Structures are given as structure tokens and as C-alpha cells.
Amino acid sequence: MTKFIFVTGGVVSSLGKGITAASLAAVLEARGLKVTMTKMDPYINVDPGTMSPFQHGEVFVTEDGAETDLDLGYYERFLRHSKMSKTNNFTSGRIYQTVLNKERRGDYLGGTVQVIPHITDEIKHRIHASGEGHDIAIIEIGGTVGDIESLPFMEAVRQMQVELGRNRAMLMHLTLVPYISSAGETKTKPTQHSVKELRSIGLQPDVLICRSEHAIGEENRRKIALFTNVEERAVITCEDADTIYQIPRTLYEQDLDDIICERFGIDAPEADLSDWDKVVDGLLNAQGKVTVAIVGKYVELPDAYKSINEALLHAGITHKTQVEIDYVDAEALETDDSLLARLEQADSILVPGGFGERGKLGKMRAIKFARENKMPYLGICLGMQLAVIEYATNVLGLEADSTEFNRKAAEPIIGLITEWLDEKGELQVRTDDSDLGGTMRLGSQKAELVEGSKLHQIYGAKLITERHRHRYEMNNRYIEPLEQAGMSISGYSAKQHLVESVEIADHPWFIGVQFHPEFTSSPREGHPLFASFVKAAIDHQNI
């Protein structure tokens, strides 16, 4: 039966609960255990699909088309044998929506609907469902202990600990141990108060992960153990690392996996972390460096492009090359000529996905720069669409645009997808008046690559599967004039012949893809498209 590890955070947010939980999952998986992970988010939004990237960071898309928290990207990158799905991320909004729908249907037989038991029961039901078929399920609770929004989740965890017992449930609490530089001291009091807050709602941590900029020391570990009622060996120190991919070994060297296996009565072989050692070695001992200019409109918050950042990092590991990212504000690039110098200094240019017209002309300016200067270019989703618009405008001389920006465009080369088959093969229909949330072409879709194309060579296969998140697509009636002018279509959707990718034949490396390859990149395997893109940047640097 599935064992559950609940992960909470205290003192401050952004301590790295997701990374720590994923690192633990990687160590347990390395011991031969079947591990899955779930993120519970206390906010009222049904999902993060319509949330601003400035507030929430990127939206990570799963194989089955769920728009989820970016932490699920960490989960997939750290786990080799477990893919996330719709069951692995849910919010307060989703829980309340489900409970209210049941109330409207009469499922509660006229009873008074309350937080306890109805909301907490729905939370517990989803936790159990997410862990089915696995040895261990790690459940991360978003936010910080003490947040009013997270109380129903904490109560559900408390109930599950009672119902499952010590041999099937345990609590891991992440906390900050700050270093006061003026006093030259590490302070344990915030951790003590954080655990006190947990205990006030009936939760006692079994493991403490103490985050700090500096070494905490054995004396402070003993002090924390004494005042929090946690076994001293279960007080795990986690100092700032050079790379997040060092964290699995950090946890392993402090026997966290042994503590968990002993608690759950699991007999499993020792973990082999040699793969992670190779990843860390590739990152920290790079033999060269390239710069990739990412031209977007959310550049003030790198988390908005988290999976792309990581995919470039993974490609760097493949080539033992440090990939430095220069974030260029697309909106500023529209009028600021001085930013062109940053494009000139880069070794390649990437325009990521996005929505809305803001920054459009700056992105197209960067695309034109890459095209005319034979600089490696990768366009993802909107980055592909704008590459098509730029080419049609400046090479074909058309008044081309997307109906996303101009519904009365003279040459609507990009338009709304009105019908497509989803990942289950079911017909989906959309109009301009459809809701924004949950109405896109989402999840894994098959694409057929044109034989002999650069993309076909990169993937080494004719049929590929990649994840999508878009509601606009290239208009097929422009395929012929584009191809006659030198921009070829290198991939189509397997069933409906939607354009999936474009490339320019007389350019060293110019590719646009409608899908999101960054969602399937991992530190141990990388991704062929990003690996080829970084190799093209290395080649361009050496010209």
C-alpha cells in the first residue's frame, strides 16, 4: 500500500519545497522504489492556466493536458520513471468547485456542506487517488504554515496521519535558519516558532529540512532537535548549493532515505546516484560558454520561463558548455536600438511562447535580426508564429498578422484553431467567445516530420510526440507561398495536418515549433532540439 510523505514549509516562502521534495523523490527512486508526487495549491484559482506569469511563474503542461504549477516541472525533471498528470496538482479553487457541483447535484442529500468534513474529505480523496499504484507518494502543500488559505489542507493531512498510522504517513517540514551577519550567528528561533505553529494545528514534523546560507553546525542541530521534538538525525541541513542537482546527494549523505525506509518498514537496495554526479560534473566543469538571448515580455521574472531555462542548462550539460541566458525585454526592444548590441553579443536567439500583443514588434525585430545575420534561432509556440509573420511580412511583402492581435487582418496567416482532436482522440470545438481557461489545444500530440528536414535529422524519427499549449495556429493556405519563398514546413500534426514546425533552408539553424519541447527535457537525458540549438550556438561562436 502507498506510503505518504507530506511536505510543508515555514518561516518564509520560496525556500525550495518543490526542489527538496523532488530531490528526495529522486533518491528514493534510485533505491528502486516507485515514487510519485503531488502539489496542493491553496489559492482559489481553479488552475494556474489564466494566472499572470509575473505572479505565478510558468504554467507547466502535463502529458494529459493539465495546466499546472511549475513545481510539477521539477518533479518530472528529477523523476525518470513517473510522469505527472491532472491528478498530481489541484487547488483550493478546484476542490471548492467539485464540492459545490456535488452539492448542486444533491450528492450530499440536503446536508449542510462544511469545510470539515466535505472539503477535507475531497482533499483526502484526491491525495489517495494521486498515490495509487506507487510505493511512495510525496505530497507538497503550497504556501507557508500559518496561511489561512492552507488550513483545510493541513487539517486533511492531520486526519490522514491519524487514519493511516505511523507506518504509512510522515511529515517533512522545510524551514529557514537565518544567518545574522552583523552578529555572526545562526538563529534557530524562527524554526522553533514554525514548528510550534504546526503543532498548534495538530501536526508534529518527523523530519526537519533546515535551509540556510551558512553551515548550521552540530550544536544548532541539537538545539533544533531538542526544542522541536524531532530526532536529531532527522534534522537535515540543506545549505545553498552551486546547482539544484546537488541536492539529491546532499539528502542522501545525511541518510534521509534511510530514515524514511526505516519508518515505513521498506527494505530497498542502496541508491546509485552516479547519474546525478555526472549531471553536476557537466554543469560545474564546463569547458566553454555560449550566450542565448531570450527575447520575451516576462523577463523580469525568470521563473516565467523556468522549463526553457532548465532545458538550455541540460543542453549545456550534453556539450559540457555553460549556457548563459541574457533576458532581453521585447517591449523595450521595439524602440531601444541599443538593445540590438546585446543581440549581436549573443550566440543565438530564442523567442518563447506567450500571449497578447505586448512586445510583439520587439520579438519580430529579434527574429529578423537572427534571420538576416544567420544567427541560430529557436521560436517556441508564439515564437514560431511570429517567425512566420515576420517572414511573410518582410520577405513575401504581405500585410500578415495573427487574428489574436487583429481580427480584421488583411492576411490572417495565424488564426484561431476552431477544431482539433485532443489527447484522447475526442473532437474539441472553440470560438472567439470561448472561455480563456482550459480551452486550448493542450497536452501531448503526435507530429509527423518531413523526411530530410533539419528537424527530422535532429529527432532521428519521423513521428514524434510533444506537448502543446496554444489556441492559434498557422493558416494552411499560406503554406505554398511561404515554401516558394524559402520557408519550409517541416512538421504537421499527425491527424489534422496542422503546421507543427517551420525552418529556413538557406539558414544555418532557424527553426520554429508550435509545441513546447522544454516540458520534456531532463538533466540526465536532455532534449535533442535544445541540444542541437546549443550546438548551433557553439558553431556560430566559432565562425
Swiss-Prot record:
GO terms for molecular function: ATP binding; CTP synthase activity; glutaminase activity; identical protein binding; metal ion binding. UTP binds at S13, K187, T188, K189, P190, T191, Q192, K223. The active site is at C381, H516, E518. Residues 291-543 form the Glutamine amidotransferase type-1 domain. It is an enzyme of class 6 (ligase). ATP binds at S14, L15, G16, K17, G18, I19, D71. One of its GO terms (biological process) is 'de novo' CTP biosynthetic process. L-glutamine binds at G354, L382, G383, M384, Q385, E404, R471. GO terms for cellular component: cytosol. Its EC number is 6.3.4.2. Pathway: Pyrimidine metabolism; CTP biosynthesis via de novo pathway; CTP from UDP: step 2/2. InterPro entries: Class_I_gatase-like, CTP_synthase, CTP_synthase_N, GATASE, GATase1_CTP_Synthase, P-loop_NTPase. Signal peptide: none annotated. It comes from the Bacteria. Residues 1-266 are annotated as: Amidoligase domain. CTP binds at S13, D147, I148, E149, K187, T188, K189, P190, T191, Q192, K223. Pfam families: CTP_synth_N, GATase. Mg(2+) binds at D71, E140. Catalyzes the ATP-dependent amination of UTP to CTP with either L-glutamine or ammonia as the source of nitrogen. Regulates intracellular CTP levels through interactions with the four ribonucleotide triphosphates. Belongs to the CTP synthase family. This is CTP synthase. It comes from Psychrobacter sp. (strain PRwf-1).
